[in-house]
Regions:
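A solvent-exposed interaction/effector surface
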Residues: 1-150
Length: 150
């Protein structure tokens, strides 16, 4: 699996979060349902994205619990029910997951068990564990769908 080390400039997002479990299959169900709710809330708040859309999903560990934070780049207005977050500039290990969502945890396994242990980099994981970047290349469960993992 190919990866790159890239410096990402600081950016800000607004989004919503949901608590996850310790079970992969259940978390896929929770996150899939939550994306539907999040996208509906974007539409209700007049935050729908059209051309050149981008969305992020952050995996956050807080007080021993796991949270999934769906977000978009910050706008001028932060609607009720949305949370604002600043993402600091760091060097990131970036991987592209290509394929169905069903294989996403296999990509994470490779990142954390094969790639990272064989690099000189140590994940900070202070603000979040990792995040996913979604853009026009993402297509639900398509074999050529692309999700960037940072």
């Amino acid at each position: 699996m190919k990866y790159t080390i890239r410096e990402l400039e600081a950016f800000s997002v607004i989004g919503q979060e949901v608590e996850l479990t310790n079970y992969h299959k259940r978390n896929i169900q929770i996150s899939t349902q939550f994306w539907r709710k999040f996208n509906a809330d974007l539409k209700k708040s007049y935050l729908s994205q059209f051309e050149n859309w981008i969305k992020y999903a952050f995996m956050i560990k807080r007080n021993g619990k796991l949270f999934y934070f769906c977000s978009i780049p910050k706008r001028n207005v932060i609607p009720d029910g949305f949370i604002y977050k600043d993402i600091q500039s760091y060097k990131y290990l970036a991987v592209e997951h290509i394929g169905s969502m069903d294989n996403l945890y296999e990509t994470y396994r490779k990142i954390y068990q094969e790639i990272l242990p064989n690099t000189d980099y140590t994940p900070l994981q202070e603000e979040f564990l990792h995040f996913e970047g979604y853009d026009y290349r993402f297509h639900w469960n398509s074999d050529n769908s692309v999700i960037e993992i940072w």
